[in-house]
C-alpha cells in the first residue's frame, strides 16, 4: 500500500507531532489544563488522546490487543514522555505502511465494525492533524497564541527536510 505520497504524509505527521509536543512541554503547566468550547477536552487531555488513539489504531492494523490506556501527567516532563510515546507510535505505523489493504474487524464504541487497513491508516494521520489544530485553537482562545499551524504544515516540513 505504500507510495511516496503516503510515506511523506506519515513523515510529516511525525515531524509535526514532535514540533507540537516540544512547544507544549515548554509552556507553563497551567496551559495544559486550558479548555475552550468543551471543558472536558483540555490541551493535556487532547495531547494524551493523540497517543492513546495511536495505540488503538496500531493494534487494529496489527490485529493485536490494544495497549493499556494510561494518561501522562500534565507536567512538562509528562508531555516530554508523551512525545517519546507518540514518536514511537508514529515510527511503528510507518513500519506498517506495506500492510495489505484488507478489512479489519474490531470493537469501536462497543460495537463490532470493519474497516479497510487504508482507512485506519488515513485516520491515524487525520486524527493527529485534527487534534493538533484543536490544541492550537484552545491555546489561542486562552490568549496563548503560541502554536502557528503554518509553521508545522507540509511546506514547512519540506523546508525542514532540506536544512
Residue ranges and their predicted role:
Residues 3-9, 79-80:
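Active-site rim elements
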Residues 7-71, 111-163:
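Short, contiguous alpha-helical
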Residues 59, 63-100:
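Helix-adjacent hinge/juxtasegments
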Residues 97-111:
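Acidic catalytic patch
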